[in-house]
Regions:
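A glycine-/small-polar-enriched, mobile loop at the entrance of the PLP active site in fold-type I
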Residues: 12-50
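Internal helical hairpin/lid segments
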Residues: 286-302
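Conserved PLP-enzyme active-site core in the AAT-like
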Residues: 2-25, 52-290
Length: 302
């Protein structure tokens, strides 16, 4: 079937990789990987573990997973921050009334995209003020304002990465680390340049979400969640199909210590963000090509 069979006329996309126009053309190698993956069955948990190991080698991160988009990665990352390895908290989400649920965010980083974070049960707390926008001065949100907003209900910090984000990420991470809080970075559209993949992972952020589509040219409905082993592991447990026998299941040793998870979780809040084996292999192939030697050419085109 073609678009025309449904009465839809293909358009000339002169806008870029935006989702509303279908994103970028899928890389031909990714398309071939998708077709090949469709011919066989695999255990998705095993596949995601292998993906995590490969992402670790490529990007020098502790762990990673493939989700059904950057927004899905943000929801999963938030769920991991809120629940950790606590089965009762995983089961409770998005009800967070019994444990810390506040996520700090700079007031001028709020947008409709942060609905993905609120969907996990987080309460966003806007920090600071932007005097530039109001015409009242030249100051924007400053690091001390994050510290001043921290309470016993604070679970973490959301940082939206752009070239003009302020304070800079390093200053926010410093405040977070001083208070023992994790930082989740929304970097959905921050590639190219390819260096941002490693730079943001190496920044000290606990979790970073990227789109697997856009310039990477994987399936548009894929995303990467990269970060610490335990938080990525929590996100994975809350996304996987848990229709298994409790006596046969053990928590993946690649993410958790032997006694860290007290049993088998039920289907989690991330169940709706499952990603197919075909999409996983396609985005991993696209990423492999994206990390290749043609980056100078790509940046010139970009």
């Amino acid at each position: 079937m073609k678009y025309e069979d449904l009465g839809v006329v293909p358009i000339i996309n002169a806008c870029g990789t935006v989702t509303r126009l279908g994103g970028a053309p899928l890389h031909t190698a990714a398309l071939a990987a998708y077709d090949s993956a469709a011919q066989h069955s695999v255990a998705i948990e095993e596949l995601q573990i292998a993906v995590s190991q490969q992402l670790s080698q490529w990007l020098d991160c502790e762990a990673g997973l493939i989700a059904s988009g950057a927004a899905a990665a943000l929801t999963l990352g938030t769920a991991a921050i809120l629940a950790g390895s606590d089965l009762a908290r995983m089961e409770a989400l998005p009800d967070t009334t019994q444990f810390p649920n506040e996520i700090l965010i700079a007031c001028d980083q709020r947008s409709g995209y942060d609905h993905a974070v609120r969907a996990a049960g987080a309460k966003l707390v806007a920090v600071g003020m932007n005097e530039v926008v109001s015409g009242a001065g030249v100051r924007r949100v400053e690091p001390w304002e994050y510290a001043a907003a921290i309470t016993d209900q604070t679970a973490g910090i959301l940082y939206v990465q752009t070239d003009c984000s302020r304070p800079i990420l390093a200053d926010v991470i410093r405040v977070a680390q001083e208070h023992g809080l994790p930082v989740l970075v929304d970097a959905a559209g921050e590639i190219p340049p390819v260096e941002n993949l490693k730079r943001l992972v190496d920044s000290g952020a606990d979790l970073v979400a990227f789109s697997g589509g856009k310039a990477m040219r994987g399936p548009q409905a894929t995303g990467l969640l990269l970060g610490t082993r335990t938080l990525v592991g929590s996100a994975l447990l809350q996304m996987l199909d848990m229709d298994d026998h409790p006596q046969l299941w053990t928590a993946p040793a690649e993410f958790f210590a032997a006694d860290e998870v007290g049993g088998m979780p039920r289907h989690g809040i991330g169940r709706g963000f499952k990603v197919s084996k075909e999409s996983i292999m396609a985005v991993m192939t696209a990423l492999e090509k994206f990390l290749g030697p043609q980056q100078a050419t790509l940046m010139n085109v970009w």
